[in-house]
């Protein structure tokens, strides 16, 4: 051939996507198959294709100076055909042939529109025979080293266009809506060939490109990674998943044979030799057809992340050179859920809690199913490691009762979690933005129900791994004084009746089944009583005071109303009725808001007298454990804090 290998490599990367330019021999095979059939004897991808099978590809590449000497200059030709060359091709004026040797398939490497036209023309076609699939896959994988060809492999992996071998005789990019999962199987020899790119580093371009192929149900599709040099290529077989993320242009040729005999067992090696800039896409496959596509950014060093998943439930191999912690992605095999795919209807967005979890409420189960890319650095989900979240959960659940005897901060759903499941039972303080745990679930005295972002209560694992959404406010030390104020937890702190039903919910074995459902401007009352008579007497405290005094029922500002409003006051302040009504124990949490009373509150429509202009705002320094900041901001903020948000 008259062309030098460098020029042919340039032509191959620019027009045919690398390795698509024929192979000088193998007349029985189509041209694009013979390009990857192990023909390393010729000058590489630039050897001329047969003119009979490719009527629109010339024998001499357009960048050849011998051909361009009789025509326009190369710069003018490139300028004319830069963006409009694929529009003027006559393929678009011809009907779509039904044979795989179609001009549309030849042109689909240049234009996404032609790829779409080819995909649409092949909807509903029967699958080709397994023998042709096997031969094509084996020829793709086997000859990738010979035909990848140095510079062509480099440029092809950087620009990442679609190869002709990806669209070949076996309808690679066709959408097969009627195919069954078993009809797409590949033999183990062919699956092993799908792993590596070319020997010169055609990294990641192999028998299937997971971005462009829309496969059947065994191998789930994901978005194309066209920008990265090492776009992953995975060949799937029903028994195991071969997952080999192709390297950067100088990467190695990593292949793992699939383990077909292993039943539902995914292969442990998703080996990735990621380049300095490339993503390493590892795919973890479980026997149930669930793939987790883990996009790891290898921070520092050319070695990517190697993720292994053994879906039997034992710990998978996990090794990487990046600074992120070992992500034991197979701690709970039943919790692994792929990212939401538009082609697969039966997927759940959030992982379901696995059946083997023993933590009450399955917080660890609902969170441990997350693929490792959701976790920040330094957080693992392995229950055997001391710094992991699940280990902290299980240890805290085993140490105390089922209720809130553990710190609320050790819940992974407390601070910054992707699915906010425990969004109810919030503290109604305007400055308190944390989750409480529902002490009524266990029926026990939850003495340590401090706020989740109390610095003393947050677990070390949570602090290291999870940045809390809201910074700690100085008022938060107050909620831990609940333990001193409550007389050993005579009544559970009335947060909400149930974590998901804040307006009172009767649990079957609750020791205090009667709940006050009075809803005022302060929110629901939710105080619990053992008998209906106590509930009735408590309801009278809500309704006993006529006129303006009704506003005072929960806010003990004068000593004359303190005894009558003791139950309602303890209801609105989240503390039990222990101690005298005016004692510091009873007023520990909320009295700085309410002891200001009606006199210093702003009521736009009431005729009640406002305080005298020269009188200072009354601040109860003796009753509360801290100085109230609400008195400093004027009447409107005091109104908002006392009326609306507690």
Curated annotation (Swiss-Prot):
Residues 250-259 have a biased composition (Basic and acidic residues). Keywords: Acetylation, Metal-binding, Methylation, Nucleus, Phosphoprotein, Repressor, Transcription, Transcription regulation, Zinc, Zinc-finger. A zinc finger (C2H2-type) spans 514-542. The modification Omega-N-methylarginine is found at residue 636. Residues 16-28, 140-152, 189-205, 260-277, 300-315 have a biased composition (Gly residues). The keyword Zinc-finger applies. One of its GO terms (molecular function) is zinc ion binding. The keyword Magnesium does not apply. The modification N6-acetyllysine is found at residue 209. Its main location: nucleus. It comes from the Eukaryota. Pfam families: nlz1. Residues 1-70, 121-332 are annotated as: Disordered. It is found in: Nucleus. May function as a transcriptional repressor. Belongs to the Elbow/Noc family. This is Zinc finger protein 503.
């Amino acid at each position: 051939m008259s062309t030098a290998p460098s020029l042919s490599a340039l032509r191959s990367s620019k027009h045919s996507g690398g390795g698509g330019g024929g192979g000088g021999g193998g007349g029985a095979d189509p041209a694009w198959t013979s390009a990857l059939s192990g023909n390393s004897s010729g000058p590489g991808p630039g050897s001329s294709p047969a003119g009979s099978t490719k009527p629109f590809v010339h024998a001499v590449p357009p960048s050849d100076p011998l051909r361009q000497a009789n025509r326009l200059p190369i710069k003018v030709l490139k300028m004319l055909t830069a963006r409009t060359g694929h529009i003027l091709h006559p393929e678009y004026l011809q009907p779509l042939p039904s044979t795989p040797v179609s001009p549309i398939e030849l042109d689909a490497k240049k234009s996404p529109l032609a790829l779409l036209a080819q995909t649409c023309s092949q909807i509903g076609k029967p699958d080709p025979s397994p023998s042709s699939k096997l031969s094509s896959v084996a020829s793709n994988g086997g000859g990738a080293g010979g035909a990848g060809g140095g510079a062509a492999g480099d440029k092809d992996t950087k620009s990442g266009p679609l190869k002709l071998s990806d669209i070949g005789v076996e309808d690679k990019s066709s959408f097969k809506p009627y195919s069954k999962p078993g009809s797409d199987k590949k033999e183990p020899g062919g699956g092993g060939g799908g792993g590596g790119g070319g020997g010169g580093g055609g990294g990641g371009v192999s028998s299937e490109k997971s971005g462009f192929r829309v496969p059947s149900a065994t191998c789930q599709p994901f978005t194309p990674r066209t920008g990265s040099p090492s776009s992953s290529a995975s060949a799937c077989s029903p028994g195991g998943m071969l997952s080999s993320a192709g390297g950067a242009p100088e990467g190695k040729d990593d292949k793992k044979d699939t383990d077909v005999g292993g039943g539902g067992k995914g292969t442990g090696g998703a080996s990735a030799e990621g380049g300095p800039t490339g993503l390493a896409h590892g795919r973890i496959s479980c026997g149930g057809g669930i793939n987790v596509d883990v996009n790891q950014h290898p921070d520092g060093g050319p070695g990517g992340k190697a993720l292994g998943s053994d879906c039997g439930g034992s710990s998978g191999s996990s090794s990487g050179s990046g600074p992120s912690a070992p992500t034991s992605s197979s701690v709970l095999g039943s919790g692994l859920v792929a990212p939401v795919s538009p082609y697969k209807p039966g997927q759940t967005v959030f992982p379901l809690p696995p059946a083997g979890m023993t933590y009450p409420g399955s917080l660890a189960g609902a969170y441990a199913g997350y693929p490792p890319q959701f976790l920040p650095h330094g957080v693992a989900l392995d229950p055997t490691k001391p710094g992991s979240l699940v280990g902290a959960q299980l240890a805290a659940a085993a140490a105390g009762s089922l209720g809130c005897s553990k710190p609320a901060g050790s819940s992974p759903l407390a601070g910054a979690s992707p699915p906010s499941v425990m969004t109810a039972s919030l503290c109604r303080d305007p400055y308190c933005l944390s989750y409480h745990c529902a002490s009524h679930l266990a029926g026990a005295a939850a003495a340590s129900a401090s706020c989740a972002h109390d610095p003393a209560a947050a677990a070390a694992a949570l602090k290291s791994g999870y940045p809390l959404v809201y910074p700690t406010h100085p008022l938060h030390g107050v909620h831990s004084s609940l333990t001193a104020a409550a007389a050993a937890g005579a009544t559970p702190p009335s947060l909400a009746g149930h974590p998901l039903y804040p307006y009172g919910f009767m649990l079957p074995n609750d020791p205090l089944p009667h709940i006050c459902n009075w809803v005022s401007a302060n929110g629901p009352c939710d105080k619990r009583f053992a008998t209906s008579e106590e509930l009735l007497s408590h309801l009278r405290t809500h309704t006993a005071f006529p006129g303006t005094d009704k506003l005072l029922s929960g806010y003990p500002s004068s000593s004359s109303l303190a005894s009558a409003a003791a139950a309602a006051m303890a209801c609105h302040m989240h503390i039990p009725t222990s101690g005298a009504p005016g004692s510091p124990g009873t007023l520990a949490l909320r009295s700085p808001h309410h002891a200001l009373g009606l006199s210093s509150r702003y009521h736009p429509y009431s005729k009640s007298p406002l305080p005298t202009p020269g009188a200072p705002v009354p601040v109860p320094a003796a009753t509360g454990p801290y100085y109230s900041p609400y008195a400093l901001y004027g009447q409107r903020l005091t109104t908002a804090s006392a009326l609306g948000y507690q």
